[in-house]
Amino acid sequence: GETMFTTSDIGWVVGHSYIIYGPLIAGMTTIMYEGVPIRPDAGIWWKIVQNHKVTVMFTAPTAIRVLKKQDPAYLKKYDISSLRYLFLAGEPLDEPTHVWISEALQKPVIDHYWQTETGWAILTCAPGVEKTPTKFGSPSFPAYGYNLRLLHEATGQEVGNNEKGVVTVIPPLPPGCMSTVWGQDERFVQTYFTSFKDKMVYTTFDWGIRDDDGYYFILGRTDDVINVAGHRLGTREIEEAVSSHPNIAEVAVVGIADQLKGQVPMAFAVVKDPSRT
């Protein structure tokens, strides 16, 4: 009786894992839909949930930010009582977006983190296994099979709580993960396992931080860093600060050249209501 609606494309790993393999192996009905979340209107996804009695839905934070710009009436137009969970992944989920969709749906919204290379969640609260409290903006804890470590980018030493580090996994990787690059075993090793001297660890190339309760937060790619007057600033932290403004729907931060500081951050924002600017 379970029906899963994953809004991805088959060309992406989310489509493979959660439109085809996962739901069908589990004996679920799976819905494959081609289109954007606002055509013909911003209620199309919720109409699908109503008409097909969707119980589990999976999409990306960007899609939710797109819906955040639309008339909230579309969320109330359809009966989504069948929906038990909304899963979000594919990019860091900022706290304001997490809060907004949780309050709008009044359903559990599960942030989780993984990569194309892993095929399934690295960090998750696994609500189907045990009921674990979640924190807005956090994909929770390492999934079963992942021996996760946060390492200092320069020293390779494990960092403490509330310290930023590179998200790594001590091998072996669990089943379902990428095991090589086709016909190029050495390339696979050199790309993913040689970032730290004298340490054989799988590198995600993502920044992460762990709080005192053990919850992990993903801060973005290790190459998404702006060097401002010698200070390395992650774009994710700046984007989250800007997106906390109630009239901001989407934001992206990049570094631009500056004669004095080398680089300075510039934010490009999409507002929800242009008449209020």
Residue ranges and their predicted role:
Residues 1-4, 21, 25-28, 46, ...:
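Gly/Ser/Thr-rich phosphate-binding loop
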Residues 110-117, 140, 254-257:
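Beta-strand->loop->alpha-helix junctions that form or flank phosphate-binding loops
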Residues 9, 28-48, 232-238:
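ATP-dependent adenylate-forming carboxylate-activation enzymes
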Residues 141-145, 157-194, 233:
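Conserved ATP/PPi-binding loop(s) of AMP-dependent carboxylate-activating enzymes
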Residues 70, 185, 245-246:
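Acidic-histidine catalytic/liganding microenvironments
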Residues 82, 187, 247-250:
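Glycine-centered tight turns that cap/initiate beta-strands
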Residues 9, 90, 114, 140, ...:
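Active-site glycine-centered loops adjacent to acidic/histidine catalytic or metal-binding residues
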Residues 50, 57, 174, 180, ...:
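AMP-binding/adenylate-forming catalytic core of the ANL superfamily
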